[in-house]
Amino acid sequence: MNAQLKQLWTKTLNIIKGELTEVSFNTWIKSISPISMNENTIKLEVPNDFTRGILESRYKDLIINAIKLITSKKYNIEFSITSEEIFNNQQLKPKSSNDNIVVNDEMTSILNPKYTFDSFVIGNSNRFAHAASLAVAESPAKAYNPLFIYGGVGLGKTHLMHAIGHYILQNTPNAKVVYVSSEKFTNELINSIKDDKNEEFRNKYRNVDVLLIDDIQFIAGKERTQEEFFHTFNALYEADKQIILSSDRPPKEIPTLEDRLRSRFEWGLIADIQAPDFETRIAILKKKADVENLDIPNEVMVYIATKIKSNIRELEGALIRIVAYSSLTNREISVDLAAEALKDIISSEQNKQITIELIQDIVCNYFNLKIQELKSSRRTRNIAFPRQIAMYLSRKLTDMSLPKIGEEFGGRDHTTVIHAYEKISNILKKDESLRNVIDDLNKKITNN
């Protein structure tokens, strides 16, 4: 940026600042960087496509008029997206099997620069998974191999996988680190078969130091993909190369996954991530506000954390939605404004808040039992069968892991939960009276 443009932009900001609320200015204008200027046009760089759209529709004329006040000339304004954002967007586009980013002439993955260990918020719900990921990053193929991370959508699995990749590349720049989704792995395999490039495909995934595969559950039911990944896994494992996998469920719960793969996924360490607790949700919101340079009142963060409980993605999305709503309505951020901005999300979120405790209460009332009896070690049919029904419903209606469900039923093992789920599922196939009971309980739980 030349001195003339820098001086002009500083004066322009001073004019615009007097026309907007502080929130609108900080959200939309402050992030703009002037990059070039010629006789008729000034080019401005913005952080993302969403911001560009808002600036084009709402603030472009304001910027043009502010510059005209200073220069007495009407310049054309062009917005472009920062090179980092373009790079990130390219990561999301499908690529051919030969379309790789090369660092030091070695094949590597494309990792999101925002997903590092430093930007990961640690809480009780993810502390173990974070520690395991860091251990693997510090000592690839020596600490835990494979590392299997599982948890619900938007809880930070992908963040940890990218963080592992970043850490390894920072400390060993020449390492071959490949990150890929299981869907892309499958698509590349199909293309390699179609184009008769099987050997090229195998070389790509078997000659690496670290392989990170996201959403591995999607290879279930795909026989050829499972066959290929089985041999890829073996080749890497035998060569002492690190394998990191993520899934929305533990290996035991992935349906139609071959037993030989299931057993290999369990060779190393399995770490789960749960939904963040209240304190962690507050910490996540504060971190997001700091990163985005947002001034959010503490009581608004408490409101968001109280209402949005399911995952990190929805938490951060709620924060951005409130800021955008404040800017578009020209109002200061407050709890009342937050309630307006999030009314649709909160309604949906509240509908999803089915807990194991709620299921236990309703099942106990239905069968005239006490909670202590449901959690006890007693195995009489009048207690054991309702307990199995409650476990079945907990598995169907919540995102809790099998170990967590077992823990809520008197500290039982996850295999007990599996047995209960399978038993009730089998009876439901032939027993209409039980189907009616389950339907009735379902209605009571979801309408509660």
From Swiss-Prot:
Oligomerizes as a right-handed, spiral filament on DNA at oriC. Pfam families: Bac_DnaA (PF00308), Bac_DnaA_C (PF08299), DnaA_N (PF11638). Belongs to the DnaA family. GO terms for molecular function: ATP binding; ATP hydrolysis activity; DNA replication origin binding; lipid binding. This is Chromosomal replication initiator protein DnaA. GO terms for biological process: DNA replication initiation; regulation of DNA replication. Residues 327-448 are annotated as: Domain IV, binds dsDNA. It is found in: Cytoplasm. Residues 110-326 are annotated as: Domain III, AAA+ region. Keywords: ATP-binding, Cytoplasm, DNA replication, DNA-binding, Lipid-binding, Nucleotide-binding. It comes from Clostridium novyi (strain NT). ATP binds at G154, G156, K157, T158. Domain I is involved in oligomerization and binding regulators, domain II is flexibile and of varying length in different bacteria, domain III forms the AAA+ region, while domain IV binds dsDNA. One of its GO terms (cellular component) is cytoplasm. Residues 1-73 are annotated as: Domain I, interacts with DnaA modulators. Residues 73-109 are annotated as: Domain II. The keyword rRNA-binding does not apply.
